[in-house]
Design a protein with these regions (language model features):
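Short alpha-helical segment of the dimerization/phosphotransfer core of two-component systems
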Residues: 36-41
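Short acidic helix/loop segment immediately C-terminal to the autophosphorylated histidine
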Residues: 19-25
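Short conserved segment of the HATPase_c
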Residues: 13, 149-161
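Helix-loop junction within the histidine kinase core
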Residues: 52-63
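Short alpha-helical Gxxx[C/S/T] motif in the catalytic ATP-binding
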Residues: 174, 178
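Conserved catalytic submotifs in the C-terminal HATPase_c
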Residues: 62-67, 84-98
Length: 208
């Protein structure tokens, strides 16, 4: 409830202040705060609904044959434009095609979350999107040279409302949703991180 009340209180509070403020510059500043918290609240509600549907089994996984190398290229094209000026996005993948039965849209949702976190937490350096074939698994990973995750937080990052760090705004539900999705796909997520050095999030999909 705290996660919902915080942006809601900001919206109500600054709306009341804005109603009695005559200075146009101050009004604009308050409006930006209201919009920011409104977007956060909307994202939070959407994430809660998505997580609830996935965990209850009401959100179906649509399995089909998916070519993962091409999917990686598609994800890369979408995110190249989102890179900060001091950050390079690199792709490392084999030349050959890898087909497997999975839910294409859900895999992309997980990778979008990994990359979104990497972009938020990396001010300069390199973000790497990669694909490796490891036996019965396809490993898709996102590595960054960002701020990293404190060691005491690593065991809790998939807990609901747990944020990767205290510097970046978010709902704290993205990784919980990713974990639920990947488990439904028959896969797993592995994370390694070092504070001040960066993080790697790896999605393992069964290779059939």
């Amino acid at each position: 409830s705290h996660e919902i009340r915080t942006p809601l209180n900001a919206i109500v509070g600054f709306s009341e202040i804005m109603a009695v403020t005559e200075d146009e510059e101050e009004k604009h500043e308050y409006l930006e705060i209201i919009q920011k918290n409104s977007n956060l609240l909307l994202q939070l509600i959407n994430d809660i609904l998505d997580l609830s549907r996935i965990e209850s089994g009401k959100s179906e996984m649509h399995f089909q044959q998916v070519e993962i190398s091409g999917l990686i290229d598609e994800v890369e094209k979408v995110h190249q434009l989102k890179m900060k000026s001091n950050v390079e996005l690199k792709v490392i993948r084999p030349a050959e095609e890898f087909w497997t039965s999975t839910d294409r849209n859900r895999v992309m949702q997980v990778l979008f979350n990994f990359l979104s976190n990497a972009i938020k937490n990396t001010e300069s350096g390199v973000i790497t999107l990669g694909l490796k074939h490891e036996g019965d698994w396809l490993k898709i990973f996102v590595s960054d040279t960002g701020c990293g995750i404190p060691e005491d937080k690593l065991p809790r990052i998939f807990t609901r409302f747990e944020k990767l760090n205290d510097f970046v705004q978010g709902t704290g539900l993205g990784l919980s949703i990713c974990k639920s999705i990947v488990e439904r796909l028959g896969g797993r997520i592995e994370v390694s991180s070092e504070l001040g050095q960066g993080s790697t999030f790896a999605l393992y999909l069964p290779y059939q």
